[in-house]
Curated annotation (Swiss-Prot):
It is found in: Plastid, Chloroplast. The keyword Iron does not apply. Its EC number is 4.1.1.39. The keyword Transcription does not apply. This is Ribulose bisphosphate carboxylase large chain. GO terms for cellular component: chloroplast. InterPro entries: RuBisCO, RuBisCo_large_chain_AS, RuBisCO_lsu_C, RuBisCO_lsu_C_sf, RuBisCO_lsu_fd_N, RuBisCO_lsu_N_sf, RuBisCO_lsuI. GO terms for molecular function: magnesium ion binding; monooxygenase activity; ribulose-bisphosphate carboxylase activity. PROSITE patterns: RUBISCO_LARGE. Substrate binds at residues 114, 164, 168, 286, 318, 370. Keywords: Calvin cycle, Carbon dioxide fixation, Chloroplast, Disulfide bond, Lyase, Magnesium, Metal-binding, Methylation, Monooxygenase, Oxidoreductase, Photorespiration, Photosynthesis, Plastid. The active site is at residues 166, 285.
Length: 466
């Protein structure tokens, strides 16, 4: 009979299309799916495609008013995960028309929305996303990008050095500014507000901005180098956030900061637009990422959050260290470091890269290595991250036995020694300790730092493995 046939039918009849040839304009997703016992992988994969696009649990007569074939997500390939009993990588293609232009918020609401609470799945993780140029071109991306940042700062041929001001909470604005000045004066390029420093009773944002600006200008005048402090503009409302960004702009400082996951993608994209229009660099902190990305079988992998940030906009983003106190398995970390910086990234499953990604001319983002790192890590960091990165030593600067400025000196000397050694063709991985030891002979500050941290090890097995 012709017409509407009510009732529940299997998702795979509509949404599992193994013969589908993906289009250049499709957004492609790779999900790690753990079905409930008794649910076949084809049905689970089709359910993911359906629930994250046009489907619902039963046939509805309004399906007849549109062309499902044009708008539905399609599960086009399924492969079992090696070494796991009941896990599959499910590939889904979404037609571009399902998404609003220039909105990470809308893209995520579909792809990682309700489907994650779906009962037929025991767990679901979004491992990777291919954003086609047709979609990425609808975004502004980072306010400035790597090359423009180097030109603004007049710093070339080496990683940039930063430091998070500690104790993260409790300092008055004046003492905070003093710590900023000492670090910048000692040789760092940047200092940083901690991610949870917004505007609390012990230090209101306006006071902090003023004292930090004073510190920046004083350090610049004395060193002849351009300096910056990531002024955290994150706030409870977008209007308040913009007000803080405005004040930073009026002070003439080079860079501000945002917590993009807690602040949200809508706020972040607005701030990135503001920064481009006002010539401010934007540093992005990823507080809350581990809630989303740390479980191996459920959530969203950080490489997807990193791609989303490059679309939404930011000039720096924290990306793990490989060697410090926070997560980061080497190959996987390098995978999303390349994805943040480069125009083009080949599919490479050994790095967890499921799709070839072509960013066309979207500016790049500097990866920030931060968390439990100190001078002995400098050779490894220089080798792993290369020149286009920011190396941030919080405790590794402020924990120096002689104080903040000598801590900054130690880090700058160590970095310059590593860069020089690398440029001379030496092997940082093999000769790193020797390079640091030699440099410490003519730098008492570095020598003292080497002594303090020579025994420190923060080794646990990485959770983020393939």
């Amino acid at each position: 009979s012709v017409g509407f046939k009510a009732g529940v039918k299997e998702y795979k009849l509509t949404y599992y299309t193994p013969d589908y040839e993906t289009q250049d304009t499709d957004i492609l997703a790779a999900f790690r799916v753990t079905p409930q016992p008794g649910v076949p992988p084809e049905e689970a994969g089709a359910a993911v495609a359906a629930e994250s696009s046009t489907g619902t649990w039963t046939t509805v007569w309004t399906d007849g008013l549109t062309s499902l074939d044009r708008y539905k997500g399609r599960c086009y390939h399924i492969e079992p995960v090696a070494g796991e009993d009941n896990q599959y990588i499910v590939y889904v293609a979404y037609p571009l028309d399902l998404f609003e232009e220039g909105s990470v918020t809308n893209m995520f609401t579909s792809i990682v929305g309700n489907v994650f609470g779906f009962k037929a799945l025991r767990a679901l993780r979004l491992e990777d996303l291919r954003v086609p140029p047709a979609y990425s071109k609808t975004f502004q991306g980072p306010p400035h990008g790597i090359q423009v940042e180097r030109d603004k700062l007049n710093k070339y041929g080496r990683p940039l050095l930063g430091c998070t001001i500690k104790p993260k909470l409790g300092l008055s604005a004046k003492n905070y500014g003093r710590a900023v000045y000492e670090c910048l004066r000692g040789g760092l390029d940047f200092t940083k507000d901690d991610e949870n420093v917004n505007s609390q009773p012990f230090m209101r944002w306006r006071d902090r901005f003023l004292f930090c600006a004073e510190a920046i200008y004083k350090a610049q005048a004395e060193t002849g180098e351009i300096k910056g402090h990531y002024l955290n503009a994150t706030a409870g409302t977008c209007e308040e956030m913009t007000k803080r960004a405005d004040f930073a702009y009026e002070l003439g400082v080079p860079i501000i900061m945002h917590d993009y996951l807690t602040g949200g993608f809508t706020a972040n994209t607005s701030l990135a637009l503001y920064c481009r229009n006002h010539g401010l660099l934007l540093h992005i902190h990823r507080a809350m990422h581990a809630v989303i990305d740390r479980q191996k079988n459920h959530g969203i992998h950080f490489r997807v959050l990193a791609k989303a940030l490059r679309l939404s906009g930011g000039d720096h983003i924290h990306a793990g260290t490989v060697v410090g106190k926070l997560e980061g398995e080497r190959d996987i970390t390098l995978g999303f470091v390349v994805l943040l910086r480069d125009d083009y990234l080949e599919k490479d499953r050994s790095r967890g890269i499921y799709f070839t990604q072509f960013w066309v001319s979207l500016p790049g983002v500097l990866p920030v290595a931060s968390g439990g790192i100190h001078v002995w890590h400098m050779p490894a960091l220089t080798e792993i991250f290369g020149d286009d990165s920011v190396l941030q030593f919080g405790g590794g600067t402020l924990g120096h036995p002689w104080g903040n400025a000598p801590g900054a000196v130690a880090n700058r000397v160590a970095l310059e020694a590593c860069v020089q050694a690398r440029n001379e063709g030496r092997d940082l991985a093999r000769e790193g300790n020797e390079i640091i030891r030699k440099a410490s002979k003519w730098s008492p500050e570095l020598s003292a730092a080497c002594e303090v941290w020579k025994e420190i090890k923060l080794y646990f097995e990485a959770v983020d493995t393939l």
